[in-house]
A protein has these predicted regions:
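Polytopic transmembrane helical bundles with strong interfacial aromatic enrichment
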Residues: 1-132
Length: 132
């Protein structure tokens, strides 16, 4: 798969992951799908970071991809805590705070992933033009 397609894939998977958790009527099976997508996004974020480091892409893109991978790692930790609360019945203090942080990080991941995907695509196609 071309690098730009792979970078956009994480954006759409993150979007799908956010959407799955917002559909309450479909129940707990969507929580499992949400969790599975989280692990896929984690793997892709780290893979994208490694693959970007092998290119001549600007260092800024590499740094953003690295921070996205770090956020995805932290996101999984929060996700496991929330999963234990929702599916396993483990009582978690301040679960609302954890949920809010989980949401904020999800939005940061999708934003950063979109930024990297667009910038890499433009860099690869030499679409940058000097300002006048």
């Amino acid at each position: 798969m071309k690098m730009w397609k792979q970078l956009y894939l994480i954006v759409w998977l993150a979007f799908l992951q956010i959407i799955t958790i917002l559909i309450p009527r479909l129940g707990s099976s969507l929580v499992d799908l949400h969790a599975t997508l989280g692990f896929v996004i984690l793997g892709l974020a780290h893979y994208d970071h490694v693959m970007l480091n092998r290119t001549q892409a600007p260092n800024r893109l590499k740094r953003i991809a690295k921070s996205t991978a770090v956020l995805a790692t932290f996101q999984i930790i929060l996700g496991i805590i929330l999963y234990a609360n929702l599916r396993l019945g483990v009582s978690i203090p301040l679960v609302e705070v954890v949920t809010f942080i989980h949401l904020v990080i999800a939005l940061a991941i999708i934003t950063q992933a979109a930024s990297v995907a667009t910038a890499f695509d433009m860099w690869e196609e030499h679409e940058y033009t000097p300002s006048k």
